[in-house]
Amino acid sequence: CYNETMSDPLQGDPLDADVTPHDSTISPGATGPGVTTPYLDSLNEAQRAAVEALDGPVLVLAGAGTGKTRVLTTRLAHLLHQGRARPYQILAVTFTNKAAREMRDRVESQIGGAVEGLWLGTFHALGARILRRHAEVVGLRTDFTILDTDDQIRLLKQHLQAENIDEKRWPARALSGLIQRWKDKGLTPEKVSAGNAGDFANGRAVALYADYQERLQTLNAADFGDLLLHCLTVFTEAPD
């Protein structure tokens, strides 16, 4: 499992590291209006316009290799440099740990110092951090374990055996894929419609999904799909 080994791609700490406004610092470079901004010098006119538009949302549409990541990271640095936001007020999401690390490095290079408290990482890493704070909303404790794919399949195999379902005919890996697709769509067992239920184990997939979720809760565990699905539940049921 990933409970102890999986790290936030930017903080370098376990995913359950708690980041609060009190941890949010920028050091040692000076920030605020009037401070020089040499990091803007490498941008072209269109890139600079996107970075300096701080009073509202900006949509950047550009092809590969045109500097979208540079614009995003420089915009983050500019928000901090101009004192328009504290690190803990910024959320930046990427798809890979490598991209997240590179973005953090670029921002710190442009700011001229370490940035602590910035919410920057992959969807799953940030989801895990949010869940550590609000685990009780989904029936977990804050020290819940994050299962990897092998752990998940092992647990499903045990469940199929307990239900006397032929695992050779109905593989646990296939059930795992089905459950993850439902979770990717934001579907809890209660929300899976008859049309989406599939024919796994002669129509028993939804019941197996529900039992699997109950088992995870008993074990105080979550799989990768839960890191996003549970966040959706948290945002819906506890918006404050």
Protein language model features and the residues they cover:
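Hydrophobic positions on the alpha1 helix immediately C-terminal to the Walker A/P-loop
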Residues: 71-72
